[in-house]
């Protein structure tokens, strides 16, 4: 998002740029952020502009190994309700990013939403029921 100035054909006193850097790998994300920050600093210096850079990690990337307890239990629960797990990677963010970033191993489970993040998003009742069944399997004690 770029916010700059209040009139056409006028040099603004302040320009604000907001964006995000995403990667499956935290080191790559940090490297890409630092590259962008250095480009902005160099360009600001060339024209004598002042620059301030603030950042925070909203979603830290994570990978859960297939050998982990959490992964195996999730696969077990999905199979127990008659489905075949199809692990996917995503650049999207979820609570799982925050939990993993705090050392609590977790997996983001899709619930079968169709057309996610759109005005046409919906879920089939059968998929919602299956999601609840998976959740129940994950919390049950055998």
Q: What role is predicted for each listed range?
A:
Residues 134-142:
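C-terminal alpha-helix
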Residues 1-45, 49-60:
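Midchain, well-structured core segments that form catalytic/ion-binding scaffolds
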Residues 50-56, 82-89:
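C-terminal helix-coil-helix/basic helical segment that borders enzyme active sites and/or dimer interfaces
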Residues 62-77, 102:
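Short, low-order "capping/linker" segments at domain edges
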Residues 83-134:
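Zn-dependent metallopeptidase/amidohydrolase metal-coordination segment
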Residues 44-45, 79, 100:
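Alpha-helical segments within the soluble intracellular
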Residues 28-31, 66-69, 123-127:
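Alpha-helix N-cap and loop-to-helix initiation/capping positions
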């Amino acid at each position: 998002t770029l916010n700059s100035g209040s009139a056409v054909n006028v040099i603004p006193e302040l320009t604000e740029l907001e964006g995000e850097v995403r990667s499956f790998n935290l080191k790559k994300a940090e490297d890409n952020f630092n590259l962008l920050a250095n480009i902005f600093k160099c360009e600001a210096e060339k024209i004598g502009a002042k620059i301030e850079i603030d950042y925070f990690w909203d979603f830290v990337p994570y990978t859960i190994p297939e050998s982990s307890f959490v992964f195996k239990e999730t696969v077990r629960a999905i199979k127990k309700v008659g489905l075949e797990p199809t692990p996917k990677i995503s650049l999207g963010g979820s609570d799982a990013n925050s939990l993993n970033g705090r050392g609590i191993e977790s997996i983001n489970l899709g619930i079968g939403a169709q057309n996610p993040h759109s005005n046409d998003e919906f879920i089939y009742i059968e998929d919602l029921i299956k999601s609840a069944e998976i959740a129940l399997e994950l919390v049950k004690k055998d």
